[in-house]
C-alpha cells in the first residue's frame, strides 16, 4: 500500500491535547508502516478561536514527539474559495439547495421539536420550494440534499459496520449565509484534494462520518477508509479532563517526560500487540495495525507513564540525559539557582554523576532535583530529614571521620569507602551511623545516589569543604 496518505487535522484553539498527540501518532505510524505519507492540516476556519500561538504549540508539540509530517502544512481557511466552488457545483447539479429559513424560523423549529420530544432536525422546508418564494432580506445558506430513504453505512476499521437511517439525518448546511464553508464540507473537500486514503481520528467524529459520507456520495468521490479510535479517559473512567492532571503534550514535556517514553505510552492507549509494553520506534512502525485497536475507551494511568518514563531514563545514555537536562534549563534552572546553560565544569560533573542519578529518577525534573548536590552553593541548605541525621551525634561523627578523609592520598569512591569503613570499625559504630550524616552533609538530603559515588563526583576539595561546614556547626 505505497499510496497510503493519512492526515492529522487539529483545530488551533489551544495546546496539543494528549488525545490529539495519540491521534497524530496513530496516523504517523500507519503512514510509515505502509511507506506512505502523513499530512498536516490546520483546521483554522474558526477565526475567532484560532490563534498563531496555538498553531505554534501544535507544530512544536508534534516536532518534540518526533512526529514529522510530509510536505507543507495546509491551512484550511486559505482554501475557502475551493470549498465554495464545490458547494456551488453541488447546487448546480441539484445535489444541494438554497435554504431561506430565517433564524426565527429555525429557533421555532427547534423549540417545537423539544416540546414534542423529537430530535432537533431541520425539517427540509426549503428542499423543494422555488427560490422565488424567498422572503426579502434573508441571505440563504446552502444545504445538502441528503437522501431521505435507505441507510448511510460506514465500514469502520475499528468500530466495524456502523449504520444510520437516512430519515434520522437532516440536510446539513454546506455554506453559511455569509459564504463561509462549514466544517463538514471543508473536511471532505480537503481530504479529497489532498488524496487522503485513510482517516484515523477520535470516535467523537463517528456521527460526522455519516454526514461526510453523504457529501462524498453527492460529489461522486471515493470515500476514504475510516478508523474512529476510542477516546482517552481518566483513571476513574470519566473523560480525561483537567481534574485528572496534565492534558497537553507541552505539559508533559515541562514535567520532565522523554518524548520517546510518551510516544511509547500513547501507542499503548487503545492499541495492543500481545503482552509487549516497551517498543522502540522501529518496533512500533513494524507492528502497528488498525485491527489491533480496541473499541473501549483507554484509561490514562499516570503512574504507569511515570514508571515507563523511568525505564526510558535508565536506558538513555548519560550524555543524552545531560543534553535533555540542558534543554529544560531555561524553564527549570532559574528556580533552582542554575544558569540557562551549563559551563564545562558543571556539565562534566553532571555527566560523571549520571549513572547514579538516573537509577531512581522517573522524570527529568526528579533527576534535576536529585542532582541538587551537584550545583548547591555552600553552605548547603539542609532539608528536615537531613538536619535530623546530623543531630544526635551526627556532626560529631563527621568531625571524627574528617581526618581520615583528609589524609587520603588518592580520592575515589573506593578509597573514601574504605576510610569510612575503617573509621566506623575503629569507633565501634555501624557503617550507617557514619554514612547517613555524611550523606546529609554532602547532599543536603537524606537520600541520594551511592554515597561514595557522590564523593567521587564532587571531588576532594568540594567534599571536604561541605563536611567541614557541617562539622563546624556541631
UniProtKB/Swiss-Prot annotation:
Monomer. ATP binds at residue 242. CDD domains: GluRS_core. Its main location: cytoplasm. It catalyses: tRNA(Glu) + L-glutamate + ATP = L-glutamyl-tRNA(Glu) + AMP + diphosphate. The lineage of its organism: Bacteria, Pseudomonadati, Pseudomonadota, Alphaproteobacteria, Hyphomicrobiales. A motif ('HIGH' region) lies at residues 10-20. One of its GO terms (cellular component) is cytosol. Catalyzes the attachment of glutamate to tRNA(Glu) in a two-step reaction: glutamate is first activated by ATP to form Glu-AMP and then transferred to the acceptor end of tRNA(Glu). This is Glutamate--tRNA ligase 1. Its EC number is 6.1.1.17. It comes from the Bacteria. It holds the Pfam family Anticodon_2. GO terms for molecular function: ATP binding; glutamate-tRNA ligase activity; tRNA binding; zinc ion binding. A motif ('KMSKS' region) lies at residues 239-243. It is an enzyme of class 6 (ligase). It is found in: Cytoplasm. InterPro entries: aa-tRNA-synth_I_cd-bd, aa-tRNA-synth_I_codon-bd_sub2, aa-tRNA-synth_I_CS, aa_tRNA-synth_I_cd-bd_sf, Glu-tRNA-ligase_bac/mito, Glu/Gln-tRNA-synth, Glu/Gln-tRNA-synth_Ib_cat-dom, GluQ/Sye. Keywords: Aminoacyl-tRNA synthetase, ATP-binding, Cytoplasm, Ligase, Nucleotide-binding, Protein biosynthesis. Belongs to the class-I aminoacyl-tRNA synthetase family. Glutamate--tRNA ligase type 1 subfamily. GO terms for biological process: glutamyl-tRNA aminoacylation.
Amino acid at each position: 500500500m505505497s499510496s497510503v496518505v493519512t492526515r492529522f487535522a487539529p483545530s488551533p484553539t489551544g495546546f496539543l491535547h494528549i488525545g490529539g498527540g495519540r491521534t497524530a501518532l496513530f496516523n504517523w505510524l500507519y503512514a510509515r508502516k505502509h511507506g506512505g505519507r502523513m499530512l498536516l492540516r490546520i483546521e483554522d476556519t474558526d477565526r475567532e478561536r484560532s490563534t498563531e500561538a496555538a498553531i505554534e504549540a501544535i507544530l512544536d508539540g508534534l516536532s518534540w514527539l518526533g512526529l514529522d509530517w510530509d510536505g507543507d502544512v495546509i491551512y484550511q481557511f486559505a482554501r475557502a474559495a475551493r470549498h465554495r466552488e464545490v458547494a456551488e457545483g453541488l447546487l448546480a447539479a441539484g445535489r444541494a439547495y438554497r435554504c431561506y429559513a430565517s433564524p426565527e424560523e429555525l429557533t421555532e423549529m427547534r423549540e417545537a421539536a423539544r416540546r414534542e420530544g423529537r430530535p432537533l432536525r431541520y425539517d427540509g422546508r426549503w428542499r423543494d420550494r422555488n427560490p422565488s418564494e424567498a422572503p426579502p432580506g434573508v441571505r440563504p445558506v446552502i444545504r445538502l440534499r441528503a437522501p431521505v430513504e435507505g441507510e448511510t453505512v460506514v465500514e469502520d476499521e475499528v468500530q466495524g459496520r456502523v449504520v444510520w437511517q437516512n430519515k434520522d439525518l437532516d440536510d446539513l448546511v454546506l455554506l453559511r449565509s455569509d459564504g463561509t464553508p462549514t466544517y463538514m464540507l471543508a473536511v471532505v473537500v480537503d481530504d479529497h484534494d489532498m488524496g487522503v486514503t485513510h482517516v484515523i481520528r477520535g470516535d467523537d467524529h463517528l456521527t460526522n462520518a455519516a454526514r461526510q459520507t453523504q457529501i462524498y456520495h453527492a460529489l461522486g468521490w471515493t470515500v476514504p477508509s475510516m478508523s474512529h479510535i476510542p477516546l482517552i479517559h481518566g483513571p476513574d473512567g470519566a473523560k480525561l479532563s483537567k481534574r485528572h492532571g496534565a492534558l497537553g503534550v507541552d505539559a508533559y514535556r515541562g514535567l520532565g517526560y522523554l518524548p520517546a517514553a510518551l510516544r511509547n505510552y500513547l501507542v499503548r492507549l487503545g492499541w495492543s500487540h500481545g503482552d509487549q509494553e516497551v517498543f522502540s520506534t522501529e518496533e512500533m512502525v513494524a507492528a502497528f495495525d488498525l485491527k489491533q485497536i480496541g473499541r473501549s475507551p483507554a484509561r490514562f494511568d499516570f503512574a504507569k507513564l511515570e514508571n515507563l518514563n523511568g525505564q526510558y531514563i535508565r536506558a538513555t545514555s548519560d550524555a543524552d540525559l545531560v543534553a535533555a537536562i540542558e534543554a529544560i534549563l531555561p524553564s527549570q534552572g532559574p528556580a533552582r539557582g542554575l544558569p540557562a546553560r551549563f559551563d564545562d565544569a558543571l556539565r562534566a560533573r553532571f555527566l560523571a554523576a549520571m549513572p547514579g542519578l538516573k537509577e531512581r529518577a522517573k522524570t527529568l525534573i526528579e533527576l534535576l532535583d536529585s542532582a541538587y548536590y551537584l550545583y548547591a552553593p555552600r553552605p548547603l541548605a539542609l532539608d528536615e530529614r537531613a538536619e535530623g541525621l546530623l543531630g544526635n551525634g551526627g556532626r560529631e561523627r563527621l568531625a571524627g571521620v574528617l581526618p581520615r578523609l583528609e589524609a587520603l592520598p588518592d580520592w575515589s569512591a573506593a578509597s573514601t569507602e574504605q576510610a569510612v569503613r575503617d573509621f566506623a570499625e575503629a569507633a565501634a559504630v555501624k557503617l550507617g551511623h557514619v554514612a547517613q550524616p555524611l550523606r546529609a552533609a554532602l547532599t543536603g538530603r537524606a537520600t541520594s545516589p551511592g554515597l561514595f559515588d557522590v564523593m567521587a563526583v564532587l571531588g576532594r576539595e568540594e567534599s571536604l569543604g561541605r563536611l567541614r561546614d557541617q562539622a563546624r556547626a556541631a
